[in-house]
Regions:
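Metal-cofactor-binding active-site regions of metalloenzymes
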Residues: 1-233
Length: 234
């Protein structure tokens, strides 16, 4: 299973961020790709540990989580700077024979875990927004994790509402959503009818990842036309 692979390689990647960046940059250059947006979760586990149901309004939560996020933002930026410096060293970017990956522009999308509680999703979303405000390398965020997990299915509409609030709070920070990564037999059929539409119309996603069940969406043709008008890619 795709999602089970991550834990199997977690140990092997520890301390190898610079190596991985160098490898993916070189591969991109070899394939004629000059710009990458890499999804990263640095700092997110620290943020969801701070979350919890509080009865506060979203505005009150934003203020509290933004304060908690401030030192994490500094840590993530420092880690990213160090990883990129290590990448440039491995690629020889300052030397006489730089490798092809030196020419590739790398930016980052923060990962927010959709299998967490709604409060944790909100907290991680605040961190993503604060990272984007503080560090221009962080250009947006995304939801990750199995879309057909019990928590992700049960909370899907609540998560879209939270993301919509964050979008209204900071409309210039892009959201790219994995949505419609569902199939018959793996998720209740009613969920195949609305996930992509709500990602677009409620959460304000500017890009959709996967979108595999698009044909099952209610009035799929109208949804496609809407996405074409808004230039929302899949």
């Amino acid at each position: 299973h795709f999602f089970s692979a991550f834990d199997k390689v977690r140990g092997a990647r520890q301390g190898r961020a610079a190596d991985m960046l160098a490898e993916v940059a070189n591969r991109a250059a070899d394939e004629g790709v000059s710009y990458l947006e890499l999804m990263v979760s640095t700092g997110m586990s620290q943020m969801h540990d701070q979350a919890g149901a509080s009865g506060e309004s979203h505005e009150q939560q934003w203020v509290r989580y933004a304060a908690l996020a401030a030192p994490i933002v500094e840590q993530v930026s420092a880690i990213t700077r160090a990883d990129e410096a290590g990448m440039r060293e491995k690629l020889g970017c300052a030397g006489p024979s730089p490798q092809p990956g030196c020419s590739v522009t790398i930016r980052y999308l923060s990962e927010v875990n959709r299998t967490r509680s709604v409060d944790e999703v909100f907290a991680q979303g605040v961190l993503a927004h604060r990272l984007g405000a503080a560090d221009p390398r962080f250009v947006g965020f995304n939801l990750v994790g199995p879309e057909d997990s019990p928590r992700a299915l049960a909370d899907y509409r609540a998560q879209m509402t939270v993301l919509a609030w964050l979008h209204r709070r900071n409309p210039d920070f892009p959201l790219a959503l994995h949505a419609g990564e569902l199939a018959e037999g793996l998720a209740p059929p009613e969920h195949l009818l609305f996930h992509i539409r709500e990602a677009v119309q409620v959460a304000g996603a500017r890009r959709i990842g996967h979108g595999a069940d698009l044909a099952y969406e209610r009035d799929a043709q109208a949804l496609l036309q809407l996405m074409a008008r808004k230039q929302i890619a899949v």
